[in-house]
């Protein structure tokens, strides 16, 4: 059982283990773990975010691709889509579950172009978002149980609509890049839901 957990969720479990073992007054974080090269940078980012008391790192292209974009595979309307992908992609903030999250079925270049579209009102008090010109398929994840990793449980909602994003200037790339997904707004003719029998339907 423990081997299975470590294989599926290596980064969150390493963070929790380190927090339990180190003395409270210990200030420096040892990140010299025997991790594959493609996971080392990701783990160091989690360590910095986990112990930092300041603002989070600015977005990067690789971070956006890793956390927000998905490839065809598991059906987007699968009831456990969010639970599976959030664990697989290690979508957390410090040691807590995120309250909501979006996964988009699109390429990064398509998402990045939205940063140059016109501004529209956002939700949750955000003043300006950029809206996609076409409909985008994705999944909205809403936290339903627990608040600390790795016990996060989510309800999954398939959506096909206009994606609203915020963007930030990236100095190294000298261009705007996607920062957060604010919403995925379905037009009335594309409202989708699960029936009482758990069957995915699209209203006419």
Swiss-Prot record:
GO biological process: defense response to Gram-positive bacterium
InterPro entries: RNaseA (IPR001427), RNaseA-like_dom_sf (IPR036816), RNaseA_domain (IPR023412)
Annotated glycan sites: 130, 142
GO cellular component, one term: extracellular region
Disulfide bonding pattern of the chain: 97-152, 115-167, 122-129
GO molecular function: nucleic acid binding
Main location: secreted
A Pfam family matched in the record: RnaseA
Top-level taxonomic group: Eukaryota
Signal peptide range in chain numbering: 1-26
Keywords for the protein's UniProt record, in alphabetical order: Disulfide bond, Glycoprotein, Secreted, Signal
Subcellular location per the Swiss-Prot or TrEMBL entry: Secreted
Transmembrane regions listed in the UniProt entry: none
Protein task: Does not exhibit any ribonuclease activity.
Similarity comment text for this entry: Belongs to the pancreatic ribonuclease family.
Protein name: Inactive ribonuclease-like protein 9
Organism of provenance: Pongo pygmaeus (Bornean orangutan)
Origin organism lineage: Eukaryota, Metazoa, Chordata, Craniata, Vertebrata
Gene (UniProt): RNASE9
């Amino acid at each position: 059982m423990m081997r299975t957990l470590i294989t599926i969720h290596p980064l969150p479990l390493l963070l929790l283990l380190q927090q339990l073992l180190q003395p409270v007054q210990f200030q420096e974080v040892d990140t010299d773990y025997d991790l594959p090269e493609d996971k080392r940078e990701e783990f160091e980012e989690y360590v910095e975010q986990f112990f930092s008391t300041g603002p989070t790192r600015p977005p990067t292209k690789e971070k956006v691709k890793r956390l927000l974009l998905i490839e065809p595979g598991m059906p987007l309307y699968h009831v456990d889509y969010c639970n599976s992908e959030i664990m697989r992609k290690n979508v957390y903030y410090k040691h807590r579950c995120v309250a909501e999250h979006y996964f988009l079925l699109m390429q990064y270049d398509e998402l990045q172009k939205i940063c140059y579209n016109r501004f529209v009102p956002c939700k949750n008090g955000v003043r300006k978002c950029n809206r996609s010109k076409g409909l985008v398929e994705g999944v909205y994840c809403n936290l339903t149980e627990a608040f600390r990793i790795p016990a996060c449980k989510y309800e999954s909602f398939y959506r096909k609509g206009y994606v609203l994003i915020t963007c930030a200037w990236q100095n190294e790339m000298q261009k705007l890049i996607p920062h957060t997904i604010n919403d995925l707004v379905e037009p009335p003719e594309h409202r989708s839901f699960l029936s009482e029998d758990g069957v995915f339907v699209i209203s006419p």
